[in-house]
């Protein structure tokens, strides 16, 4: 967020835990929307601990609508798979099949997309969840 905060040529969107109680703690509040030329080009969608998949996908819909309105040329996804219900450090409630749904939703944007794995600590399920995103994206 910080490196893009004053830029209008890149839209930054993040769905994450509410920083008042969850990581990233020090930034990512909904009111942080950018500054100067970047005002309005930073969208934080913080969610309460224990948020359901329905809540998370509601935030994803908001994110995708904003990305579509922006008219992006490409999409870079910092893919945090710590949203998995079985993740030892997270309180989100996504299940394995939700990751395929995530991939499908991002594919519907019709943008060249790069996925960068950023988090996910349920080691036994991490690979399956990552593959589910890619398979959903490619379907």
Language-model segment annotations:
Residues 111-119:
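Short acidic/histidine-rich active-site segments
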Residues 95-96, 125-139:
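Short, electropositive alpha-helical surface patch
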Residues 55, 122-126:
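Secondary-structure boundary/capping motif
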Residues 1-107, 134-135:
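Conserved alpha-helical scaffold segments that buttress catalytic/binding sites
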Residues 83, 119-123:
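A short, acidic, flexible beta-alpha connecting loop/helix-capping segment that sits on the rim
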């Amino acid at each position: 967020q910080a490196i893009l905060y004053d830029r209008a040529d890149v839209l930054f969107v993040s769905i994450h835990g509410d920083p008042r109680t969850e990581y990233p703690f020090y930034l990512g509040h909904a009111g942080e929307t950018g500054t100067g030329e970047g005002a309005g080009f930073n969208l934080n969608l913080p969610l309460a601990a224990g948020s359901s998949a329905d809540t998370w996908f509601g935030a994803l819909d908001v994110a995708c609508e904003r990305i579509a309105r922006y008219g992006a040329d490409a999409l870079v996804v910092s893919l945090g798979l710590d949203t998995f219900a079985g993740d030892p450090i997270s309180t989100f409630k996504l299940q394995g099949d939700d990751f395929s749904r995530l991939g499908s939703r991002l594919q519907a944007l019709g943008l060249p997309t790069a996925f960068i794995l950023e988090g996910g600590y349920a080691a036994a399920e991490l690979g399956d969840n990552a593959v589910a995103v890619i398979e959903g994206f490619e379907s």
